[in-house]
Curated annotation (Swiss-Prot):
SMART domains: BowB. It comes from the Eukaryota. Pfam families: Bowman-Birk_leg. This is Bowman-Birk type wound-induced proteinase inhibitor WIP1. Residues 1-15 form the signal peptide. Keywords: Disulfide bond, Protease inhibitor, Serine protease inhibitor, Signal.
Length: 102
């Protein structure tokens, strides 16, 4: 069987296109994985509503007057429109076991 130079060129271009698609997908997946979870290395003093997973990560759903000092992302959980006494929740993800109950 005689191979045509055009056929060889088309096969090479197709192979390059497929490799480019796989390279783009690998780059996109690497970017997603690097943004996955920001883990706080600290330990909460206490947590009553602990969400522990078998991966060793946990979050605390306690709503308190103030967030724990180790908390990096403290958000308002309950707005107190008239009294001015907002309640806060720490939205950090921690590594380890849940601390004692508050």
């Amino acid at each position: 069987m005689k191979s045509s130079p055009h056929l060889v060129l088309i096969l090479c271009l197709q192979a390059a296109l497929v490799m480019g698609v796989f390279a783009a997908l690998a780059k996109e997946n690497a970017m997603v994985e690097s943004k996955a979870i920001d883990i706080n290395p600290g330990q909460l003093k206490c947590c009553t509503n602990c969400n522990f997973s078998f991966s060793g990560l946990y979050t605390c759903d306690d709503v308190k007057k103030d967030c724990d000092p180790v908390c990096k992302k403290c958000v308002v959980a309950v707005h107190a429109s008239y009294s001015g006494n907002n309640k806060f929740r720490c939205t950090d993800t921690f590594l380890g076991m849940c601390g004692p109950k508050c």
